[in-house]
Amino acid sequence: MKKHIRTFLAVMLAMTMFNACSSNENFDENGKIANAFEQRRNLVGGNYFDIFGELDGLRLQAMQFMYAYMPLPDIADYPAEYHLQNVDYALKARAEMPWGKTVPVREFLHFVVPVRVNNENMDTSRAVFYNELKERVRNLSMHDAVLEINHWCHEKVTYTPSDIRTSSPLATVRTAYGRCGEESTFTVAALRAMGIPARQVYTPRWAHTDNNHAWVEAWVDGEWHFLGACEPEPVLDLAWFNAPASRGMLMHTNVFGGYDGPEEVLSVTPCYTEINVTANYAPVVTTNVKIVDKDGNPVKATVEFKIYNYAEFYSAATKESNENGETSITCGHGDMIVWASKDGKFGFTKFTAGKDCDVTVVLDKEPGYTATLEMNITPPKERNTIPAVTAEQAGENARRYACEDSIRNAYVATFPTDAYATELAAELGLDNATVATLFKQSRGNYATMVDFLRACPADAKEKAMRLLFCISEKDRRDVSLDVLNDHIVAALESDNNTDWFYNFVVNPRVSNEMITPYRSFFKSVILADDVMKYKANPELWVEWCRNNIKVADTWNPLSLCMSPKGVWEMRVADTHSRDIFFVSAARAMGIPARVDEVTNKTQYLCDGMWVDVNFEALESNNAPQGKVKASFVPSAFIDNPKYYSHFSISKIVDGRLQLLNYPEDATWESLLKDGSALDTGDYFMMTGTRMADGGVLAHLTFFTVEEGKENRLQYVLRESNERLQVIGDFNSENLFYDTTEQRERSLLSATGRGYYIIALVAPGSEPTNHFLRDVMPYKDEFEKWEQKMVLLFRDTNEAERFVNDFPELPSTVVWGTDINDNIYNEIVANMKLKNPNRPIILVADTFNRVVFMSQGYSIGLGEQLVKVIKQLSE
């Protein structure tokens, strides 16, 4: 925070000018903001509000607006001077940008002033972005400025998947890539920095495929328009997800504060208003829902609207029914599950939006409920609308796209090379391969790694490396030097080299929080005698937390992670931050502790056993457990179903589903073949087969786990002989060498979004010749389909030996070579192939789903493929 405090006085001087220009404006004509602020100040107390005595005018009103609705972690972890600097830059943009005064007060307060976009770690990006972008967009229209800012964003960042913690905008820039949630957070931050109202829109889960997505909406001259973050197009309302979004069941955004815009309100919290924007992308319809008990009496209950995705019923929206048991949802035209619960009882049903106008849910399921059910789920159909783009616009955008790639790649080229890693490893006496991996993963944060390792004593460098690989890969991209220096002390002060010591004492990461240098802080505020007492009996530390930390989930509805130091100082936190605080302080005292990744239970290690922490009871006790096993008969393509792809298990707690978060590589074999221990209680296992059209054949099993007993289930994976179904997965981000363009590129970049055909072929082989000749008669059909057919040889030698005697192949063919057999090896592993025979042909899509596979000699492949693509087009 030192950087923004140093600039504070300079900003104050600048504000003197443009506050005068804004003297006629009033952000709080009816006094609503001032009243909300006073209520919040009385609730929180402390010295967090001292700065307000120095403020007046629009600065005061904007700061009151922020603090009236700000989640607790943002009050506790960021000084008031930080929030004031961001307010000042918002007012500066409003005064200096040509569109500034055209933005209504409502849109300015809710979509420009707040620096927080989602759950990211906040930083000083607003000032940085404003100063970098102001001259670039000053003379543009608001419309063109939005497009230009997205081009600038693409110069800085491109897509790559990563974990759930959202990097700050500046960390994303330093890394030069991010997942969609980070790209959209970054782009919204850039737009808001320039005084353009912007919001992050997301579909929590697609209905037609196992994934989700986030993008950006910008307010331009009175209307909201969408764009793909860091994916510039020649016009607004155009992105690769136009078609998928038209199949969306629900798309929404969280708006800071008490927003009263025209959109449907899904929920209102003390900090934000959740609104429904699905109608911006897909045809929608409203379904009315009534919740009743077994006698038909209306019930005021919790109502969750769920979408099948990642083999679970995911809650896309949660509402409360009124005194008459009524609520409603506006969503796309497809199947959704409505799940209601009250006092441990629950009920659910599937409804088809657009067909079922009124739905009744009966709360007739009670603890101990067991059953097996089948359910067919149908997503919305595609209704794609694409805005017009001229050939000139597309060509210019492609030219700029390539230029922006080169700018970003030039920056990435400054990251350490393997040669530098070898040199540094020799200097520090460390393993060369490990240092090279560290540099590749730390990317733009590599200098922090170098400074940290060089500063460590020679006999402690291996300990330093262990710390660096305890934290997550994303941590290595944005962790600060003071954090590393703070936490290495635990390793330096101990001779313990066990994995549990490094993972659960030295490791600063507990859950999904931004890691901070809390260890030295706790050593300074917790008395040494108390540390000895807590280490001897960790239940005393549980008791201290129970008695001293007030839980207030209401004021942190997004479950942002308050820093452990912030929790100690405020003595108020949400449940999740309280749990992280407990573990962090315990580790600082040398007590092994964790938040279990599967069950989310807070635990400490005692006599080699993990003890469940119970902050409500007087003493912590481990829950009794039983065992669950499931038998499974392998299918032709699936012999070991994957968790999240083919099945999931949730515990039913107070009538609601709580997913067990097993590792991403968990399977039936690792969890259920020989059985897993589960806490006693009620459970729900979902298995599902995703069809090529996005539909799902689901099987639902409700079961109980009793103490000391084994429950044996039947794992049922439904199949269809009539419809194409998803039979495997294949990464569309895989690289190949394009022999026409003579460069490496991803399959996704070559094929574009949607389905495509990929074939691994062998020059001169009879099966490959048959395949290519079978394709030629259907040249017109493949070209009408317009999707790519990627034909890959094993290497350059094979490509050079190939004699192209197949003149009538479709023009959509892309020729290339595999790189180090990477694509071949993945297909063999994922599709369970028993031999290396080529050709190997897949029909897959860029959501990584495989719906057709053929290997080796086969006659009539051209006709088979045409039948497949026709089904995909229906």
Write out the residue ranges for each language-model feature.
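A short, hydrophobic beta-strand/beta-hairpin element that forms part of a small beta-sheet core
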Residues: 837-856
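N-terminal "domain-start" segment that seeds a small globular fold
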Residues: 713-749, 770, 817-818, 867
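Short, internal strand/loop/helix patches
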Residues: 804-838
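Extracellular beta-sheet/turn segments enriched in Thr/Pro/Gly and aliphatic residues
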Residues: 267-280, 352-389, 621, 698-731
